[in-house]
């Protein structure tokens, strides 16, 4: 019995009931459409063609650090995801929840055919979170977010983190010589989790790190061209002017 069959055996009724409920009622997403973590969740919702209600949290005014938002996430960070009585924060936990509940709908974002494929998927999700994201997030902050707030980019930090990111991308280049995507030959949460920072960095000088590696460049071109991701980045359609459920 493979991993997916075991999960279904353990939670068959919960999963079916949960999926039906969400298709009817939709979800609530508290966040900011320009936030990398919020966009990560929106991308999964669009890949799964799911209904959701966007609720704007005004980061500029510090709304996320005050009540009532802190009652949703005591760490004061976006996004927060509401599914009835279930309230989740941490974007990667949210994406996995959605991908599992709706595993039979839309894009198959989990590779659970065997213990090995499940472990490989999990390994690459950890690599994204602990190897790629730290330097990528710092580079996004320095080159994209700070200028928005009128703050000066620290070029020393940029240089240091580009050097770290280069080492990560060298490993990615080698991996992508063997596989179309990072976890396997199909698009999964692993690739999706990279999208928010990559999208912002493509508008900065750091873009060169992705472009000078042929396999990485091809991978980036493919994942950033997905329709679900384009929708997640279109804040007018996916957030501000989105019809309420």
Swiss-Prot record:
Residues holding glutathione: 35-36, 64-65, 77-78, 90-91
Domain GST N-terminal: 25-106
Predominant cellular place of this UniProt entry's protein: cytoplasm
Enzyme class (EC, first level): transferase
Family stated for the protein in its record: Belongs to the GST superfamily. Phi family.
Molecular function per GO: glutathione transferase activity
Keyword set, alphabetical order: Cytoplasm, Detoxification, Transferase
Organism from which the protein derives: Arabidopsis thaliana
Secreted found in the keyword field: no
EC numbers: 2.5.1.18
Record-level GO BP terms: toxin catabolic process
Disulphide linkage map: none
Role description: May be involved in the conjugation of reduced glutathione to a wide number of exogenous and endogenous hydrophobic electrophiles and have a detoxification role against certain herbicides.
One Pfam family in the UniProt entry: GST_C
Protein name: Glutathione S-transferase F4
Subcellular location: Cytoplasm, Cytosol
Residues annotated as domain GST C-terminal: 114-244
């Amino acid at each position: 019995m493979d991993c997916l069959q075991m999960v279904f055996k353990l939670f068959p009724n919960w999963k079916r009931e949960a999926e039906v409920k969400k298709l009817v009622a939709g979800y609530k997403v508290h966040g900011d459409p320009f936030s990398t973590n919020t966009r990560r969740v929106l991308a999964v919702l669009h890949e799964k063609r799911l209904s959701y209600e966007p609720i704007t949290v005004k980061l500029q005014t510090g709304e996320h650090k005050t009540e009532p938002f802190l009652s949703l996430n005591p760490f004061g960070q976006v996004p927060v995801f509401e599914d009835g009585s279930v309230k989740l924060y941490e974007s990667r936990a949210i994406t996995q929840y959605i991908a599992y509940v709706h595993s039979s709908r839309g894009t198959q974002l989990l590779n659970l055919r065997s213990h090995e494929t499940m472990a490989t998927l999990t390994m690459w999700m950890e690599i994204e979170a602990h190897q790629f994201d730290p330097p990528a997030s710092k580079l996004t902050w320095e080159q994209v977010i700070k200028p928005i707030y009128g703050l000066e980019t620290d070029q020393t930090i940029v240089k240091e983190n580009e050097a770290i990111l280069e080492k990560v991308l060298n490993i990615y280049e080698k991996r992508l010589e063997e596989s179309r995507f990072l976890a396997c030959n199909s698009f999964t949460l692993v690739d999706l989790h990279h999208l928010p920072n990559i999208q912002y960095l493509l508008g900065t000088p750091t873009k060169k790190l992705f472009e000078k590696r042929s396999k990485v460049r091809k991978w980036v071109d493919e994942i950033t061209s997905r329709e679900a991701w384009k929708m997640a980045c279109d804040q007018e359609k996916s957030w501000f002017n989105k019809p309420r459920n």
